[in-house]
Amino acid sequence: MSNWPSEQFNPLELTLDPLNPRIEVPENASQADIISAMFEYEEIVELANKIAAEGMLPGERIIVTRENGFVMVLEGNRRVTSCQVLLNPSLIPEAYKRDIIKPTEDVLHDIRNIQADVSPDRHSAERILTIRHTEPGIKKWTPIAKMRRAARLYDLGEPVASIAKMQGASEEAVRRVIR
């Protein structure tokens, strides 16, 4: 993977993978069917709203391959789906249209072109996909680690409201930690 090229893509030009093991759709499923399944089973509302509010996280790699004339998303189907519906709200399934918040112009600008690593083929990416989704990866912080981080950020001058937003906690919870 370290020698795979990295390219910029408009998410609307990427093809969601019908073979994505997260969802069960026919191999010839339309992109609309895949998006619907992603919304139904893969918490796209939450992810799209997080991206709409905060943008994409740097360092989260998307992996694509060129397959049958399409640029197929092998890793990052949830993120790409989220970006697609933020860029083109008409792609949002009817049942979810009211649930997606409108992104800022800055976020729209940032997600119009996203970086992806280009695998030479699907097979070459299999090992990476397996490691990413089945083996221990990023270890979640313990509650104590979160408290230490909040205290350090506060000591560095970060406002309580900002720390609370970063950690998805109430301001009161942060105040209790930094006392």
Question: Where on the chain are the PLM-derived regions?
Answer:
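Short, charged/polar connector segments at secondary-structure boundaries
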Residues: 1-104, 110-117
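Amphipathic, charge-rich alpha-helical segments that serve as recognition/docking helices
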Residues: 35, 97-178
